[in-house]
Structures are given as structure tokens and as C-alpha cells.
Amino acid sequence: MKITLVNSRLDPAGVTIREQIQVLLADPEYQREGIDWEFLEIDGRLIHQERIDTGLNSDLLIFLSRHTSRRPVPVLTVHPTGNPGEALLGGEAGSFAPAAPGWMQAVLQNLVRLVPDGYQASYEVTHHGPTTLSTPSFFVEIGSTDHEWSDPVAGAAVAEAVLTAAPVDPISLIGFGGTHYAPRETAVALETRGAFGHILHSREIGGLTGSLLAKIATAAEAEAVYIDRKAIDRPALDHLYALLEETDLPVLGEKELHQIGSLSWQEYRSLRQIAGDAAPGAHLVIGTLPGGGTPVTATVPADLLAQAISADQGRVMTAIGRMPVVGLTGRGGLLLPIIITYERYRSQIIHDLITLCVKTIREEQHAVIDGDRLIIKKERFDPGLAASLGVPPGALFGMLKGGQAVRVGDQVIKPEMVRSCTVTAIHLRGLERYT
């Protein structure tokens, strides 16, 4: 792989980073098999270097640059180039350069690990040129004043972050929403496999069009979308969702990105599709499902699962998390009686889930077995009975519900006087196998 490191003689931060990279490359420890580092120093501003990759035959361009800000803070950043709107700082309006999401994520993760005291590290949203490139690229920057631009410690941190970057199975995303330093996207990239190709500031969402979205998706090599919903106003958010409905890009939340684990994106998307067909709108709860298998659905008796969740939802969900399955949750986060697993596990998983439910019910509730029937008896505080005995709603209800006797006038009302009993029978053929 050939990587070209581009800096400008006019840019003190770029010069600092380049010098520190050259120092590190003199050490054999930083020589990496399969990577050929090439330096390219120019005289002009980096943001105006359209088509600079012509004839380079590089696989990746990394622009070494200074960062400026109206509110200068010591910062190390990475970002792709492009102009969602006007081209105020190089490039073309409504144009986006090919991104390198995995490499940007890897460099960002290293920057956070190596960041000097007093500095911060983050993404920046997509902005400025150059945009007319055919080679994937990104900027890595030191900000935001002369002091930081010439700081050899900051330069060394960036140099090591670049030279040791190693993308690991990233999921390429477009990020929508947030401020200039993209705090949520930064957190996602640090904590999950989500790697952003392009990121749009909240103010750009309202002006987004379908054709612009298509350009961004292509330049970002996007597999999915992440939205910082809290950072986008409702009209712009509705506009964005309407545009996304015309694409095949799934929207992934932070929780979902955390759950994907080591599953390949293709495997995860297949599971997501199966879940959508089986229970539209359901959310996935991924257990210990390994990669490689034929995914199938399986069901457990809905009434049995409901009783087990009522008895101890935490126990059931913890067990699901330890099984090679994908659980599905509906409204309110309740587990649905449909699970996804691999075909080779299906029979055993059904047996294990039914056994889990039966044991949970028997251990947490008053339940007995009668042949193929699991009979569950529940006693509950009955507010109707309490009211019929003259107990006013409020604190006395709470005391009775908690097992305390109360006095109403001359009468003592005991908890057992205001309880009603329900009996539920669940039929399970071969129930003895699950006890």
C-alpha cells in the first residue's frame, strides 16, 4: 500500500508533523511491511490542491495541516474534505472527496491514546477543499495557534498516530448532526467499529437533497448512517428521514453499534433484515452469536415467555445475552417470543429457552406442574377490594400493598383481606423435559 503524506511549506503545523514522521521512520520499529510512505511537499495552501493525486498512483493521501478556529483551543483532529454548501475554503460547492473511514478512525483512536496534556482529540465535520480527488484522503491537524503548530510534542503524537494506524474491520458510516468537533461521532468511533466517512454539521441538514446525499454516500463508501438526533431540530430531522427512506442505507444507533461486536457487516445486516421481516420495528439484542452460519427464526410460547418476564425480566435478558441468539424486543423493550439463531443451534436453543422460562417461573413464583400443564398462582393487592372495605386511595393503599395492616375507623384491614388470586395454566407438551 502506498500512502502519500502531503504538507505545505506555508503551513508550520504540517512541517512540524512531517519532521516528526521523518524522525520516527528512521527507527526500524516504525517501518511496516506492506506500507510505502511517500512525502509530497508543496508551496500553496492544501485546501486548494485539486487533483493533486493525479499521477501519484497512491492508495491513500494524508494531508498534514494546521487547524485554525475563531475560538482557538489546543486540539488534534482528523476530518474528510468536502463542501455540503458553498465552497468558501477551496474545492467545489456540493462536492465531496473520497474518504478513508477506516484510516481516519484508526488515526483518531491513536490521537486519543497519544494526546499530549492540555490537548483534546476529535473528528471535525466535513468541510473545505480539496474535493476533486480520485484517491481516498483525509486531513490530520494540529490546532489552533502558532504555539501548537510548532509544538514538537504535538507533532510527535500526530506522527505516531499516523504511522501506527491500523484499521480493523470498520463499518463505514455517514454522520449527521452535531457541532464542528462532532462529539457524538467521535465517541462512536472510539467505542465501536463505526467509522465515519463524512460528517455533516447540524446546520447543513435542512439544505440536504437526495442527489447530495447520494454523493456523500458514494464518497464515504457508506454502509449505514448514524444520526445525532438530539443535535438536529425536528423539521430538519424529519427532512433527513424522508431522504433516507429513498435509500437502502440503514440508520444505526449507538446501542446497536455497540452490539454488533465481531459480526461482519454482511452478517449483521442479514440478521437485521430477518428481524425486520419477522417483527417490523423490533430492536435486536445480540447474545454470543458467532460469525458464520445460516440464520433462522425460532419461537417460544408467548404466554410462557410473558410469565417468565413478569417473574424476573433481568434474569431472562441476562440469559439471552449469554446464548448464541439474537433476541428481539418490541415497544417498551419487552422481549418478543421470536429469536434468531443459526440453523445448527435451533433445536437446542428452543429447548434451552423453554427450560429457562419454566425454571424462572417456578423459582420466582408460586407454580406447580400437573402433567403437561404449568399452573401459576398469583396473589396481588386488589385496589377494588380495598376500596370496598373503605380504604381511601393513597398512602394506605401503599401500606397494604407492602404487606402492612392499616386501620380505617374502628376496623383493622389486613393485607390478606385485600388480595385477589389469579390462576394461569400453560400447556407444554413434554413439560417434564424442561424441569
From Swiss-Prot:
NCBIfam families the UniProt entry points to: PRK14866.1-3
EC number(s) on file: 3.1.1.96
Membrane-crossing segments per the record: none
Sample GO molecular function, one term: zinc ion binding
Residue stretches in coiled coil: none
Family as reported in the entry's similarity comment: Belongs to the DtdA deacylase family.
Keyword Hydrolase: yes
Keywords carried by this UniProt record: Hydrolase, Metal-binding, Zinc
Gene3D superfamilies: AF0625-like
UniProt cofactor note: Binds 2 Zn(2+) ions per subunit.
Organism of provenance: Methanosphaerula palustris (strain ATCC BAA-1556 / DSM 19958 / E1-9c)
Assembly with partners or alone: Monomer.
Biological process per Gene Ontology, one example term: D-amino acid catabolic process
Cofactor(s) it depends on: Zn(2+)
One protein family per Pfam: tRNA_deacylase
InterPro entries hit by this protein: Deacylase_DtdA_archaea, DtdA
UniProt name for this protein: D-aminoacyl-tRNA deacylase
Catalysed reactions listed for this entry: a D-aminoacyl-tRNA + H2O = a tRNA + a D-alpha-amino acid + H(+); glycyl-tRNA(Ala) + H2O = tRNA(Ala) + glycine + H(+)
Purpose: D-aminoacyl-tRNA deacylase with broad substrate specificity. By recycling D-aminoacyl-tRNA to D-amino acids and free tRNA molecules, this enzyme counteracts the toxicity associated with the formation of D-aminoacyl-tRNA entities in vivo.
Cited HAMAP family: Deacylase_DtdA
